[in-house]
Amino acid sequence: MGPKSRIIHEQPNIENTIPASLYQAVSPERFSLEDDDKFVIYGGGNSYAIQVLQNDPSQELVVCPELESVDYSNVSLFVLNTSLIVWFNSADLGLELPYQSIILHALHTLSDDTFLYLQILSNECITSIPSGTTEFVPSIEIRIVKNDKPGNPLNDNPLLVHNSNSSIETVYEAMSKCSAFHFDSDSEDESGTYAFDSAEQTPALEIPSHWLNNNVDDVDSDEALLRNTGIADDLEIDDVDETGNVNEVAAMHVDVGYASIAGSIRKRDEDDVSIAKARRVE
């Protein structure tokens, strides 16, 4: 199971987060990989507003106490390599949404206004409770729009100061790039393999049963039969058996030089004869 959404009380800062351009310049060989030391920010900005939608009357939304009294019209967005952070500037806390918990993110235009639409899994921070039995996974819909109201300069994060051209479109593009770094945990559970695992399972090779059967009566005469008896039959691959003689024994010549042959058995009287013959050799 992947990481879950949670409440955080420390926003990304210059000590634990670096811009993507700087990270790519200093660590090109690890670009797009998760860093163990610092987070990487790909986008974001100040002066955004979010809205939790309740379009499904068959589901009840329950918000955790920390998010009940916060100002949803004044938030900052941090698009990190690991998650999307929605920081509530007035409450000094944030909602961290790992990309594995974001089912869908898309751009939507309504009355000439473009907003970012998110569909996330139900979590402990914002819970979706179905009124009855359903086959669908409980989810929450969130709308993020650009807030034209000027923000408090004291709330400006140094990581977002350089991103003066922040917009809904740039946030969407940054999320699309970062979400591609992470595998789908649901696909892993269903298939039993990791999306990033190079050792994927190969399809099984179907071998006709008559290829492995010693009885060749039912085999077409034009079809070559390779025997597999386990007696060094792979030493001469070009020697194709088309007769089906099961009494043949595969063998090969081995020059052992002066080495002893393990497993040879000789009688006691043969030892004296062999030693005498060896002494007569000049």
Swiss-Prot record:
Query: Keyword ATP-binding on this protein?
Result: no
Q: Which GO terms describe its biological process?
A: mRNA cis splicing, via spliceosome; spliceosomal snRNP assembly
**Cross-referenced Pfam families:** Voldacs
InterPro entries (UniProt xref): ICln/Lot5/Saf5, PH-like_dom_sf
The subcellular localization recorded is:
Cytoplasm; Nucleus
Assigned GO CC terms: cytosol; pICln-Sm protein complex; spliceosomal complex
Among its keywords, does the record have Cytoplasm?
Answer: yes
Source species, domain of life: Eukaryota
Which keywords label this protein? Answer: Cytoplasm, Nucleus
| Family matches, as PANTHER family | CHLORIDE CONDUCTANCE REGULATORY PROTEIN ICLN, METHYLOSOME SUBUNIT PICLN
What protein family does this chain belong to?
Belongs to the LOT5 family.
Question: Any idea what this protein is called?
Answer: Protein LOT5
